[in-house]
């Protein structure tokens, strides 16, 4: 949580309150379970909110080749750049060649909202990830899927970060299977 400067789980240890971050584990595990190869790939992150440092750390752990970041408010992207100097910032709307694109903005929480991309230029071997899990298919994911891209929403990230928090609090991680996931 020090590197990400983000805490989403707190617990008590020897009368001290400790802050931890399970978003890194959640994002990394969800990518691994999606069977997408991330190593030596180029990632483009849309947004610069609180979860983005965790996403960057997870991508680095998975040995992505290059990380690009764009945000509607350029100052917020530059704050992330101060934390991760190797990240290349872009102006909002600029798109570079990428293998994985991650929507970490709030665009898509409302059904009528969509990210303005030229989806026709995006080949079928691209991977679109949206941290939003409700709705389960945002306009971003729907359009990408219509053009043949692989897509994943943030549901599994949410589940895995919750499992990480549960393990911190209880000392063990419960097993989950497809049946349980369908219920969530």
PLM features: residue spans?
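Conserved S-adenosyl-L-methionine
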Residues: 61-66, 146-150
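Phosphate/diphosphate ligand-binding glycine-rich loop within oxidoreductases
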Residues: 1-34
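Glycine-rich adenosine-cofactor-binding loop
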Residues: 21, 31, 40-60, 71
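NAD(P)-binding Rossmann-fold cofactor-contacting core
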Residues: 62-84
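Rossmann-like adenosine-cofactor binding region
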Residues: 85-152
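Rossmann-fold NAD(P)-binding glycine/threonine-rich loop
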Residues: 12, 127-180
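Short helix-loop-beta connector
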Residues: 13, 36-42, 123-124
């Amino acid at each position: 949580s020090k590197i990400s400067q983000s805490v989403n789980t707190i617990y008590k240890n020897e009368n001290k309150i400790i802050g931890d971050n399970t978003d890194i584990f959640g994002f990394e595990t969800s990518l691994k379970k999606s069977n997408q190869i991330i190593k030596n790939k180029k990632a483009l992150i849309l947004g610069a909110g609180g979860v983005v440092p965790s996403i960057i750390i997870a991508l680095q752990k998975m040995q992505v080749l290059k990380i690009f970041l764009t945000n509607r408010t350029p100052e917020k992207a530059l704050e992330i750049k101060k934390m991760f100097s190797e990240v290349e910032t872009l102006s909002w709307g600029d798109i570079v060649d990428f293998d994985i694109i991650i929507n970490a903005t709030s665009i898509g929480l409302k059904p009528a909202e969509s990210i303005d991309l030229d989806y026709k230029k995006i080949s079928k071997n691209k991977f679109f990830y949206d941290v939003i899990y409700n709705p389960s298919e945002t306009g971003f994911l729907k359009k990408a899927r219509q053009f043949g891209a692989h897509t994943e929403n943030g549901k599994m990230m949410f589940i895995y970060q919750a499992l990480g928090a549960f393990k911190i609090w209880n000392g063990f991680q419960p097993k989950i299977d497809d049946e349980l996931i369908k219920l969530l």
